Swiss-Prot record:
Glycans are attached at N133, N137. It is linked to Developmental and epileptic encephalopathy 14: A rare epileptic encephalopathy of infancy that combines pharmacoresistant seizures with developmental delay. This severe neurologic disorder is characterized by onset in the first 6 months of life of refractory focal seizures and arrest of psychomotor development. Ictal EEG shows discharges that arise randomly from various areas of both hemispheres and migrate from one brain region to another. Epilepsy, nocturnal frontal lobe, 5: An autosomal dominant focal epilepsy syndrome characterized by childhood onset of clusters of motor seizures during sleep. Some patients may develop behavioral or psychiatric manifestations and/or intellectual disability. The phenotype is more severe than observed in other genetic forms of nocturnal frontal lobe epilepsy. GO terms for biological process: potassium ion transmembrane transport; protein homotetramerization. Residues 352-488, 781-921 form the RCK N-terminal domain. It comes from Homo sapiens. It is a multi-pass membrane protein. Residues 1204-1219 have a biased composition (Low complexity). This is Potassium channel subfamily T member 1. Na(+) 1 binds at L513, H516, S538, N540. Residues 1-37, 660-689, 1048-1078, 1204-1230 are annotated as: Disordered. Residues 1-93, 179-192, 234-246, 339-1230 are cytoplasmic.
């Protein structure tokens, strides 16, 4: 095929540069010559055209030719090179300015030398002229100008001054030439140029005219040129070292130099002019200037002639104009510096330790939480905190940072973490850690997370070796900051904690107390026994130690974990909860009896303080042993933990009771049964029940508490006889659809087939089922309702812990999501695989929505803080709507357990608020006193928080701060909350103490029983007790026997408290309609006893008050009946059955015993009788067990040894399940 010819360019028809036709072939290049080498042009040698190829002559044939291009040729000129050396180059120009500054200082020094060597009394005259003597006549008004015009200058001094003047003149001319920009007059009339000419040209003239060598030249004016050179030199110096935050330093330097120049000019000027007067010395003139400028004016030295007087006036006027301007600029810069915070010096960063706190906006609550928690650790007292925030300090933060306690340790810098200059100011690369916190009160929390992510990236880019501690809000954004050393996701922890609150009461309080640093001294001055006990146990935290270095645990090397946990608690009062192998990074909570301890293991334990700060007082231990064996003081109540020495022996716990019967003491309002008889064996009360010893090594028959895989009998679902529902088989597996990247896989109970989206809607029927209300579903267990604004990805973490594989299938509670907005498709896809999970659109402030979602059949209601209300125009008002709505629900549904999330922890005092409650006022005073004492847990005595009924996510901020010292705290917290699952690690659950368990008597004996029978580790108690909240204890008294009547009908006090694991749900007031008349009769009996006691125990005034309370109770009861009628009418209007509400609307005395700071029936009769609940973390071994106690347990992983021992478990599980994992949860048929 013939090749097509390229069309000719217009230039091809013209002659080439060498005169040859364009069409002629170009000379071939030598063989082997690279076409990349520059081609040699043809034509004559002198032809400029032959050396450079024209731009328009780039044809196809010349495209391979190259032209060497030289850049920045404009800088090759002589002027540009001089400009580069004298002006542009930072280091060379700095040297030039330093030389110029030294030159000016030298001229001022030479002037002072000339003044000191000059003596006017020896004669005055020009160079080589005859000298004339002059004496001042004070009476004459004429001035002899000769002493002012002529001075005595030595030859050597003159020569030096001439040389310096010539150098200064030449340098000035050169700089004028280099900085010339077209306007010469601008250069000439500059003050610095005029001064240069005045001080240099006369010296140059004296070279050619010798008589003028004694002419006076005001060389002292060079001080102003020196000041100008110093300013330029400092600017160049800062530019050379890349220091940009130097305005304050420059202004201070300018002000100081201005003052110095004014004084020096006035001193030298007055001294010279007074040569025609009294001939003042330089020192006297300096004294006069200082006295005059300081406005003192003694009058002992005064100028005598008018020129010197005129100079003084001029100098004062200049000072009055210049100095205020300088001071104004200095004050302005100082105020700006106060706002921006200045710098953290490099020297301090290298010699001191500091951490950096990066926040979007700094609020006083966040600041104090951080400072109190960070500086609660003794080894952090010498650390500095540098706060980097883009906003100005508000008034409250500024006031706090001016307190001497914080002003010496906290440095506030206004700046952005995205700017390297601000990170340099904070010396991020030298920091020990960087905490990056998100602004949770923003309306757009996703945008707040994005800002946090960028800050984390910026810090990692600038200081890759600085440890990062990042707080993120949304779980879907967590994977962007996985590179950080420690990450806390707020919504993950929040929802998991609220979920556990439904099955393990007050988990939020338990975790909050664990992650706060405390010495256990809160409430120790309170007269209330429960406050002292609660405050003392709140000081327990998680610590770690290497087993081989531990006095607590090293004696148990080679023993089982369970054996070590029990004996360490028995001997030292410490609670061993987990460990970590040296060759494994995973932390295992309660790995079980088959785990043998090694010296290299890292042990994690709960105690008041770490072992290194503990003292061992063995003498007291021996005394207490003797007392224990003699039967004295064994059951006198909870032992007091020593605070100063922290750890001493808790005494040996006797494992056999000393008697067959014991009447508990009534202390501080705690109540129990009148008689607690021990169970008998073979019909005889002579034998005491025994507890099996904890084995050093687990034998083959040792069982974990509940093996959910090998024993399926527990999970077999019995079809309901009256409902006729089809049995749905559940499977165990991992959820197939995670709503976000980075969620930890957890083995859960799942549906074998995903439920259609239409079946997830609770209040609307579909083609698969026609149920439109909760009762129609016929749930065996009570509902858990979650009220949230949107179905965010964090809500997924509420469901997973409640559907984890280790939860008994018979204990799974139906979950109803009450959402303000319709969930999206991705969220429904994630939850459709879980059994008994439904949603409904509605709001918590709408009664119809609450009734439709089945609130009267609910066991727990969780009210999640709404994102749209987290920010308010007025501080702390963000929770107003939530608080009022929850208060309304308490009035409408008093038997419901409600857990509320608040934005601000300080607002928890408004939960279940009663204005005339004297006990709440007393607690408020206690909180203020604890806050004044510097406690980190001042809010802990608020009854809603102590009972776990209120929670704020800001309480968990300390988890991130505490991780700086304890890098394992986030991992342990996530394991306890069920967010992470590690093979072989246990999980948190709870067990309820019933009257049948009271024979165990003490917490230490319970510890032994659980360790020996089911390998469970108890870590605390959730206690509910009655309390008399009265100003006069004699006014109203409640006998324990009065409570026994109701307990005989409804069971133990804590039967309404939801538990998890093997513990069971709460009884409702309407389990059997037939029992309500009996309960109401018991309530009336209680009221009659109360009415009989009141007149006896009080005088006439008390009786009158009692009568007024009775009248008030009648009014309140009518109010409750009105609310009840309102609810029933709405239920009838919606087509819902009212039988359930009729049952639960009537509360009895035992209901009150199970409510936290509630109890409308008894409380309306008198405002003093009530109950309270609180958490005891790791109580002493001899702490008395009480009915209604709920014990927190860490249960071993049931999958830990399935492969090795499934057969042995199967054979022996049948006769041990009744004792190891008792079923105490009553199933309520709806």
């Amino acid at each position: 095929m013939a090749r097509a010819k390229l069309p000719r360019s217009p230039s091809e028809g013209k002659a080439g540069p060498g005169g040859a036709p364009a069409g002629a072939a170009a000379p071939e290049e030598p063989h082997g010559l690279s076409p990349l080498l520059p081609a040699r042009g043809g034509g004559s040698v002198g032809s400029d055209v032959g050396q450079r190829l024209p731009v328009e002559d780039f044809s196809l044939d010349s495209s391979l030719s190259q032209v060497q291009v030289e850049f920045y040729v404009n800088e090759n000129t002589f002027k540009e090179r001089l400009k580069l050396f004298f002006i542009k180059n930072q280091r060379s120009s700095l040297r030039i300015r330093l030389f110029n500054f030294s030159l000016k200082l030298l001229t001022c020094l030479l002037y002072i030398v000339r003044v000191l060597l000059d003596d006017p009394a020896l004669g005055i005259g020009c160079w080589g002229c005859p000298k004339q003597n002059y004496s001042f006549n004070d009476s004459s008004s004429e001035i002899n100008w000769a002493p002012i015009l002529w001075v005595e200058r030595k030859m050597t001094l003159w020569a030096i001054q001439v040389i310096v003047a010539i150098i200064s003149f030449l340098e000035t001319m050169l700089l004028i030439y280099l900085s010339y920009k077209g306007n010469i007059w601008e250069q000439i009339f500059r003050v610095s140029f005029v001064l240069e000419m005045i001080n240099t040209l006369p010296f140059i003239i004296t070279i050619f005219w010798p008589p003028l060598r004694n002419l006076f030249i005001p060389v002292f004016l060079n001080c102003w040129l020196a000041k100008h050179a110093l300013e330029n030199m400092i600017n160049d110096f800062h530019r050379a070292i890349l220091r940009t935050q130097s305005a304050m330093f420059n202004q201070v330097l300018i002000l100081f130099c201005t003052l110095l120049c004014l004084v020096f000019t006035g001193t030298c000027g007055i001294q010279h002019l007074e040569r025609a007067g009294e001939n003042l010395s330089l020192l006297t003139s300096f004294y006069f200037c200082i006295v005059t400028f300081s406005t003192v004016g003694y009058g002992d030295v005064t100028p005598k002639i008018w020129p010197s007087q005129l100079l003084v006036v001029i100098m004062i006027c200049v000072a009055l104009v210049v100095l205020p301007l300088q001071f104004e600029e200095l004050v302005y810069l100082w105020m700006e510096r106060q706002k921006s915070g200045g710098n953290y010096s490099r020297h301090r960063a290298q010699t001191e330790k500091h951490v950096v706190l990066c926040v979007s906006s700094l609020k006083i609550d966040l600041l104090m939480d951080f400072l109190n928690e960070f500086y609660a650790h003794p080894r952090l007292q010498d650390y500095y905190v540098v706060i980097l925030c883009p906003t100005e300090m508000d008034v409250q933060v500024r006031r706090v940072l001016q307190i001497p306690l914080w002003s010496q340790r906290v440095i506030y810098l206004q700046g952005s973490a995205l700017k390297d200059q601000d990170l340099m100011r904070a010396k991020m690369d030298n920091g020990e850690a960087c905490f990056i916190l998100s602004s949770r009160n923003e309306v757009d929390r996703t945008a707040a997370d994005h800002q946090t992510i960028l800050r984390a990236w910026a810090v990692k880019d600038f200081a890759p070796n600085c440890p990062l501690y990042v707080q993120i809000l949304k779980p879907e954004n967590k994977f962007h900051v996985k590179f950080a050393d420690h990450v806390v996701c707020e919504e993950e922890c929040k929802y998991a904690m609220l979920a556990l609150n439904c099955i393990c009461p007050a988990t939020s309080t338990l975790i909050t107390l664990l992650v706060h640093t405390s010495r256990g001294q809160e409430g120790q001055e309170s007269p209330e026994q429960w406050q002292r006990m609660y405050g003392r146990c709140s000081g327990n935290e998680v610590y770690h130690i290497r087993m081989g270095d531990s006095k607590f645990f090293r004696e148990y090397e080679g023993k089982s974990f369970t054996y070590a946990a029990f004996h360490a608690h028995k001997k030292y009062g410490v609670c061993l909860i987990g460990l970590k192998r040296e060759d494994n990074k995973s932390i295992l909570l309660n790995p079980g009896p088959r785990h043998i301890l090694a010296a290299s293991d890292t042990c994690f334990y709960i105690n008041i303080t770490k072992e290194e700060n503990s003292a061992f007082i063995f003498k007291q231990e021996e005394k207490r042993k003797k007392r224990a064996f003699s039967g004295q003081g064994l059951h006198e109540g909870p032992a007091r933990l020593p605070v100063h020495s922290i750890i001493a022996s808790m005494g040996t716990v006797a494992m056999d009771l000393q008697g067959t019967e014991h009447r508990p003491t009534q202390s501080g309002g705690g109540g129990g049964g009148s008689k607690l008889a021990l169970p008998t064996e073979n019909g005889s009360g002579s034998r005491r029940p025994s507890i099996a010893p904890v084995l050093e090594l687990a034998d083959s028959s040792a069982l974990l508490p509940c093996d959910l895989l090998s024993d399926q009998s527990e999970d077999e679902v019995t079809p309901s006889d009256d409902e006729g529902l089809s049995v749905v088989e559940y499977v165990k597996g991992y959820p197939p659809n995670s709503p976000y990247i980075g969620s930890s896989p957890t083995l859960c109970h799942l549906l074998p087939v995903k439920a259609p989206f239409c079946c997830l809607r609770l209040d609307k029927g579909c083609k698969h089922n026609s149920y439109e209300d909760a009762k129609a579903y016929g749930f065996k267990n009570k509902l858990i309702i979650v009220s949230a604004e949107t179905a965010g990805n964090g809500l997924y973490n509420f469901i997973v812990p409640l559907r984890a594989y280790y939860r008994s299938r018979k204990e799974l509670n139906p979950i109803v999501l009450l959402l303000d907005n319709k969930p999206d498709h991705h969220f429904l896809e994630a939850i459709c695989c879980f059994p008994m999970v439904y949603y409904m659109e509605g709001s918590v402030d709408n009664l119809d929505s609450l009734l439709q979602c089945g609130i009267i059949y609910a066991d727990n209601l969780v009210v999640v803080d709404k994102e749209s209300t987290m920010s308010a125009e007025e501080d702390y008002m963000a929770d107003a709507k939530t608080i009022v709505n929850v208060q309304t629900m308490f009035r409408l549904f008093p038997s419901l357990s409600i857990t509320t999330e608040l934005t601000h922890p300080s607002n928890m005092r408004f939960m279940q608020f009663r204005a005339k409650d004297s006990y709440s006022l007393a607690l408020s005073k206690l909180e203020k006193r604890e806050r004044e004492n510097g406690s980190n847990l001042a809010f802990m005595f608020r009854l809603p928080f102590a009972a776990g009924r209120v929670f704020s996510i800001s309480m968990l901020d300390t988890l991130l701060y505490q991780s700086f010292v304890k890098d394992y705290m986030i991992t342990i917290t996530r394991l306890l909350l069920g967010l992470d699952t590690t093979p072989g690690s246990g999980y948190l659950c709870a067990m309820k103490i019933t009257e049948g368990d009271l024979w165990i008597r003490t917490y230490g004996r319970l510890f032994q029983k659980l360790c020996s029978s089911s390998a469970e580790i108890p870590i605390g108690i959730y206690r509910t007790e009655s309390h008399v909240f009265s100003t006069s204890e004699s006014q109203i008294s409640v006998n324990v026997e009065d409570c026994e009547d109701t307990r005989e009908v409804k069971g133990p006090w804590g039967s309404r408290a939801g538990t998890g694991g093997s513990s069971q749900g709460r009884h409702t007031g309407g389990g059997d309609p037939a029992e309500h008349p009996l309960l109401r009769r018991k309530s009336l009996q209680w009221a009659r006893r109360l009415s009989r006691k009141a007149p006896k125990q009080a005088g006439r005034a008390a009786a009158a008050e009692w009568i007024s309370q009775q009248r008030l109770s009648l009014y309140r009861r009518s109010e409750r009946q009105e609310l009840s009628e309102l609810v029933k009418n709405r239920m009838k209007h919606l087509g819902l059955p009212t039988t359930g509400y009729e049952d639960v609307a009537n509360l009895t005395a035992s209901d009150v015993m199970n409510r936290v700071n509630l109890g409308y029936l008894q409380d309306e009769m008198n405002d003093h009788q009530n109950t309270l609940s609180y958490v005891l973390i790791n109580p002493p071994p001899d702490t008395r067990l009480e009915p209604s106690d709920i014990v927190y347990l860490i249960r071993s992983d049931p999958l830990a040894h399935v492969a090795s021992s499934s057969q042995s478990r199967k054979s022996s599980c049948s006769h041990k399940l009744s004792s190891c994992n008792p079923e105490t949860r009553d199933e309520t048929q709806l």
